[in-house]
Amino acid sequence: MSEPRKILVTSALPYANGPVHLGHMLEYIQTDMWVRFQKHRGNQCIYVCADDAHGSAIMLRAEKEGITPEQLIDNVKAEHSADFADFLVDFDNFHSTHSDENRELSSMIYTRLRDAGHIATRSVTQYFDPEKKMFLADRFIKGTCPKCAAVDQYGDNCEKCGATYAPTDLKDPKSAISGATPVLKDSKHFFFDLPAFDTMLKSWTRSGTLQDAVANKIAEWLDSGLQQWDISRDAPYFGFEIPDEPGKYFYVWLDAPIGYMASFKNLCARRPDLDFDAYWGKDATTELYHFIGKDIVNFHALFWPAMLEGADLRKPTGVNVHGYLTVNGQKMSKSRGTFIKARTYLDHLPPEYLRYYYASKLGRGVDDLDLNLEDFVQKVNSDLIGKVVNIASRCAGFIHKGNAGVMVDANAAPELTDAFLAAAPSIADAYEARDFARAMRETMALADRANAYIAEKAPWALAKQEGKQDEVQAVCALGVNLFRQLVIFLKPVLPNLAADAEKFLNVAPLTWDDHKTLLTHHQLNPFSALMTRIDPLKVEAMAAASKEDLTATDTSTDAAPAGNGELAKDPLSAEIDFDAFAAVDLRVALILKAEHVEGADKLLRLTLDIGDEQRNVFSGIKSAYPDPSKLEGRLTMMIANLKPRKMRFGISEGMVMAAGPGGEEIYLLSPDSGAKPGQRIK
């Protein structure tokens, strides 16, 4: 028998400024099912998580509520913990990034990086709120759009016309926090030298640690050239102060992933059987897996492994990425009642129904998952009640009535039990590969065969015939054994059903290997209903409650990333209709020339080839591309039908597209290889 595997598993850390919703729960349920499967198989699998408890957003919300940030994160942690527990997400430890362990580990990792020469400093110019005495992120600046003159727009994009721009381009800028007019101010920032790890990352990301689609996306970023990563923020800021640098704090995304380590270290203090270095030391032979949403891939597949490498620590065995959640084919919506908080769901429906539905649709890829509420009702009622539970309810009564609840020693259909036994390795492989949808399909196919057998034998009809009692008992004993097999296969997804079934079956907690045996001459306990059908009215009530509580209290946007990434900190803009989008002409452009603009602090002049003509475009990306010549020869994406804009330095004939919060973190977008200048993007 092989030695049990030693596995450490994490989910992305939920941000500690509000409740979790069903989009978040997709990730935690997915991770929990995989962890439960590993434990079911006899492996030592540890599952840790924590609240992501730092950042300006938390500091400002606490101030708005008249409490300290510590009080806010304690309150939110209690809410998160209750929601996770009630959704049967069984963490071995749920901690907080605002902890002594995380402070110690963050300082240690930073110090190692600094001493190894991987930290640089330079001056950065940003808007500063003179009343609040704080530097302002782009989303904390509002003013008049420089393109369409719409008022009350954010510092990086216009919600009315969709334009993106640098905060310094905004007209009449105001602090969104105090209303004061911000001023430009220089500050020393600290940068992690990510480009120094380019070779390692190119190898590591192609070593099987990522899904192919994710590795391909990472390759695009690597091929475009990595930039140094700004890891500091200025006081006032809620977080950890950088060692030996008063008034300078770690950016939340530096200490957030270190929170995985901190939560595990906190657990190690209570579990003498666990050795921290055995899981995080450079030469660790244990397994380490991160489950995340696709919105935070860059942090986990670029910054995080590079930090670990530079700090002489182990890198993850795998980073498992999933897509977003949609509801009824659309993004979650307050107005439609489909922006559903975890607690709102739990107030109306049992957690295992959603766990099963997610499992039935979760493959191993990064595609988005749609929660169709009508399909949800139909699938749960059909599969769980109509197929799985139905087997036990059909058979148990005959065993109790005809044989005092004792299962006879008979296998009425060996070919059927052999089929169940033969299916187990494939189902296990599906679980291991995180292809839960395949595991559920194959399990339900077995349930169909079991139900077909019972329907064919019709014990309810046999019981009425003279001399058929032995056959009735044999058929029903087999039915209960097949039900037991199904429960074993479903236990990682449906732990409560498994526990209730174990009571009915009068057995110890089932393990995966129990599928190899049958119960014979075994006493059952009385059967009671294990699950009830979903009443569609309860789903309607849940949607109605979601409209009410989210309209009244929630400040989130309609977007529903299933993790805790950039959307949580930089919400989506307001919806536009299709006609508004269709009016934007997006084209592939080849950068022929890129150069500094004399007298401009943030602009580069780009000469673009869009097929049959050339365009001159000024772009505020200088801070991220100090050597513009490296952009020459690269394909990018541009808005080609934007009205030319006369600037002090010339006329700008369009706009190139980039992502990132601004400053040093600007990432020019590129199409996939094979695209040609002038091709329409659609």
UniProtKB/Swiss-Prot annotation:
<feature type="short sequence motif" description="'KMSKS' region">
    <location>
        <begin position="331"/>
        <end position="335"/>
    </location>
</feature>
<keyword id="KW-0547">Nucleotide-binding</keyword>
<dbReference type="InterPro" id="IPR015413">
    <property type="entry name" value="Methionyl/Leucyl_tRNA_Synth"/>
</dbReference>
<dbReference type="InterPro" id="IPR014729">
    <property type="entry name" value="Rossmann-like_a/b/a_fold"/>
</dbReference>
<dbReference type="Pfam" id="PF01588">
    <property type="entry name" value="tRNA_bind"/>
</dbReference>
<dbReference type="InterPro" id="IPR041872">
    <property type="entry name" value="Anticodon_Met"/>
</dbReference>
<dbReference type="GO" id="GO:0005829">
    <property type="term" value="C:cytosol"/>
</dbReference>
<keyword id="KW-0067">ATP-binding</keyword>
<feature type="domain" description="tRNA-binding">
    <location>
        <begin position="580"/>
        <end position="682"/>
    </location>
</feature>
<comment type="similarity">
    <text>Belongs to the class-I aminoacyl-tRNA synthetase family. MetG type 1 subfamily.</text>
</comment>
<dbReference type="InterPro" id="IPR029038">
    <property type="entry name" value="MetRS_Zn"/>
</dbReference>
<feature type="binding site">
    <location>
        <position position="334"/>
    </location>
    <ligand>
        <name>ATP</name>
    </ligand>
</feature>
<dbReference type="GO" id="GO:0005524">
    <property type="term" value="F:ATP binding"/>
</dbReference>
<keyword id="KW-0030">Aminoacyl-tRNA synthetase</keyword>
<dbReference type="InterPro" id="IPR009080">
    <property type="entry name" value="tRNAsynth_Ia_anticodon-bd"/>
</dbReference>
<keyword id="KW-0479">Metal-binding</keyword>
<dbReference type="InterPro" id="IPR001412">
    <property type="entry name" value="aa-tRNA-synth_I_CS"/>
</dbReference>
<feature type="binding site">
    <location>
        <position position="145"/>
    </location>
    <ligand>
        <name>Zn(2+)</name>
    </ligand>
</feature>
<comment type="function">
    <text>Is required not only for elongation of protein synthesis but also for the initiation of all mRNA translation through initiator tRNA(fMet) aminoacylation.</text>
</comment>
<keyword id="KW-0648">Protein biosynthesis</keyword>
<keyword id="KW-0963">Cytoplasm</keyword>
<dbReference type="InterPro" id="IPR012340">
    <property type="entry name" value="NA-bd_OB-fold"/>
</dbReference>
<feature type="short sequence motif" description="'HIGH' region">
    <location>
        <begin position="14"/>
        <end position="24"/>
    </location>
</feature>
<dbReference type="GO" id="GO:0000049">
    <property type="term" value="F:tRNA binding"/>
</dbReference>
<keyword id="KW-0694">RNA-binding</keyword>
<keyword id="KW-0862">Zinc</keyword>
<dbReference type="InterPro" id="IPR004495">
    <property type="entry name" value="Met-tRNA-synth_bsu_C"/>
</dbReference>
<comment type="subunit">
    <text>Homodimer.</text>
</comment>
<dbReference type="GO" id="GO:0006431">
    <property type="term" value="P:methionyl-tRNA aminoacylation"/>
</dbReference>
<dbReference type="InterPro" id="IPR023458">
    <property type="entry name" value="Met-tRNA_ligase_1"/>
</dbReference>
<dbReference type="InterPro" id="IPR014758">
    <property type="entry name" value="Met-tRNA_synth"/>
</dbReference>
<protein>
    <recommendedName>
        <fullName>Methionine--tRNA ligase</fullName>
        <ecNumber>6.1.1.10</ecNumber>
    </recommendedName>
</protein>
<dbReference type="InterPro" id="IPR002547">
    <property type="entry name" value="tRNA-bd_dom"/>
</dbReference>
<dbReference type="Pfam" id="PF09334">
    <property type="entry name" value="tRNA-synt_1g"/>
</dbReference>
<keyword id="KW-0820">tRNA-binding</keyword>
<dbReference type="InterPro" id="IPR033911">
    <property type="entry name" value="MetRS_core"/>
</dbReference>
<dbReference type="GO" id="GO:0004825">
    <property type="term" value="F:methionine-tRNA ligase activity"/>
</dbReference>
<feature type="binding site">
    <location>
        <position position="158"/>
    </location>
    <ligand>
        <name>Zn(2+)</name>
    </ligand>
</feature>
<keyword id="KW-0436">Ligase</keyword>
<dbReference type="GO" id="GO:0046872">
    <property type="term" value="F:metal ion binding"/>
</dbReference>
<dbReference type="Pfam" id="PF19303">
    <property type="entry name" value="Anticodon_3"/>
</dbReference>
<feature type="binding site">
    <location>
        <position position="161"/>
    </location>
    <ligand>
        <name>Zn(2+)</name>
    </ligand>
</feature>
